[in-house]
A protein has these predicted regions:
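PIN-domain endoribonuclease scaffold, especially VapC-family toxins
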Residues: 40-97
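Short, well-structured N-terminal submotif of metal-dependent ribonuclease cores
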Residues: 1-51
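Active-site neighborhoods of divalent-metal-dependent phosphate/nucleic-acid chemistry enzymes
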Residues: 84-119, 123-124
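Short, active-site-adjacent cap segments at secondary-structure transitions
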Residues: 18-19, 59, 125-127
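Residues that scaffold the ATP/ADP-binding catalytic core of kinase and kinase-like folds
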Residues: 20-22, 64, 129, 144-145
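Short secondary-structure boundary segments
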Residues: 15, 55, 121-123
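Acidic, PIN/NYN-like endoribonuclease modules and their adjacent C-terminal/linker elements
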Residues: 104, 117, 123-157
């Protein structure tokens, strides 16, 4: 019998956290007063979690960052990094979970990707009871990785 293996936590990052994090990098040194920037730095430097996203989420990231006048080179580099390092999903639509229809892609991605967490600055938009994913604010400890579904099903046999 094989021993179940844990995995890195899997998470979805709301656009609000990405924007707040990037603003922390603009000022140079990432300070402890910007937990969104710390989350991004930790993911870039230490791969602290598996970032889950979809094409729809990538499009939103890109549109919001451009609207906020983040340099095109910065936006391009970030999108390329996410395409290379994150797990890109095609979740489809889940139905109405969030009170904000713009947040539905994040909910659908979290559910389809078996996310351990969804990190946001707007927790009211992501009702904890409607999601199987833990909703976190930046700076809260990330949950530890769970057993993979494949390994969990092996254990039950």
């Amino acid at each position: 019998m094989t021993t179940p293996r844990s995995r890195r936590p899997r998470g979805v990052v709301d656009t609000s956290v990405l924007v707040a994090g990037i603003s922390g990098f603009r000022s140079g040194i990432v300070s402890s007063s910007n937990p969104s920037a710390q989350l991004l730095r930790d993911w870039i430097e230490r791969a602290t979690f598996t970032w889950l996203l979809s094409e729809e989420i990538l499009s939103e990231y890109k549109a919001v960052l451009r609207r906020l006048k983040v340099r095109r080179e910065t936006v391009g580099a970030l999108i390329n990094l996410l395409r290379e390092e994150a797990e890109l999903l095609s979740p489809g639509t889940k139905g109405s979970i969030s009170s904000d229809p713009g947040d539905e892609p994040f909910c659908a991605c979290a559910e389809a990707g078996d996310a351990d967490f969804l990190v946001t600055l707007n927790p009211r938009d992501f009702p904890q009871g409607a999601l199987t994913t833990k909703v976190l604010a930046p700076g809260e400890p990330l949950p530890s990785g769970r057993m993979t579904k494949r390994n969990a099903s092996r254990k039950q046999k």
